[in-house]
């Protein structure tokens, strides 16, 4: 059987044991044991997308070196394999890991290296979708340019982060540039904002909607949603 995971966040899937290991290695104080990691992500039951996203600051803090990124990507793909997944698409906001020792391309390369190691060992095929953060228009523009410059290293372009007041149409120029380069577009919409944001995502070239749970509020757009929605 051919099983696929098409929506996953690399910074949301660290093994608790790895988070503890990397926190100790990097002297990151908020994480001292595996329970700390679980407590951060218990926020998934929160009704606030913003509160939930805050938990990711702790995992991103551990993704600041080539070796850490490589390990996390490898383990993410390996864990997918253990769950009988053959094809895995993961997304990450690369500029969250850019620092004096890591360029944006280094971040992408490290993640792809981890994916390739898992592919060589287990046969699972993985690909990276790069995310722009919608509350920072300059970041969205920079990630779009990065995607175009290194389109051979990625499989898609996305925007993520807080949705309210950050509609997809704000970034239409970036979406158009990416689309013109033949890069697939997926957009987070219809969670922190209403169904109108899903329609905007479709209007701006999205082939797939991230989350989209509020479509239930208005199913008038259902004919626009295809098999990859």
Where are these regions (language model features)?
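Metal-cofactor-binding active-site regions of metalloenzymes
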Residues: 1-183, 190-197, 202-203, 207-208, ...
């Amino acid at each position: 059987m051919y099983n696929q995971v098409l929506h996953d966040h690399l910074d949301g899937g660290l093994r608790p044991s790895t988070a503890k290991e990397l926190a100790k290695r990097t002297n990151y104080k908020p994480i001292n044991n595996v329970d700390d990691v679980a407590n951060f992500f218990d926020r998934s039951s929160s009704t606030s997308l913003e509160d939930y996203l805050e938990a990711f600051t702790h995992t991103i803090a551990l993704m600041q070196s080539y070796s850490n990124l490589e390990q996390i990507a490898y383990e993410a793909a390996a864990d997918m394999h253990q769950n009988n997944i053959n094809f895995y698409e993961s997304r990450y906001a690369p500029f969250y890991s850019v620092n004096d020792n890591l360029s944006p391309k280094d971040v992408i390369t490290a993640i792809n290296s981890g994916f390739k190691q898992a592919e060589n060992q287990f046969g699972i095929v993985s690909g990276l979708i790069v995310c722009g953060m919608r509350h920072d228009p300059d970041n969205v523009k920079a990630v779009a340019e990065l995607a175009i410059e290194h389109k051979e290293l990625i499989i898609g372009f996305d925007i993520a982060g807080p949705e309210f007041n950050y509609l997809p149409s704000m970034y239409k120029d970036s979406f158009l540039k990416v689309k013109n380069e033949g890069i697939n577009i997926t957009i987070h919409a219809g969670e922190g904002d209403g169904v109108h944001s899903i329609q905007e995502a479709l209007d701006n070239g999205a082939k797939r909607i991230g989350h989209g749970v509020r479509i239930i509020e208005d199913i008038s757009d259902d004919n626009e949603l295809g098999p990859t929605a």
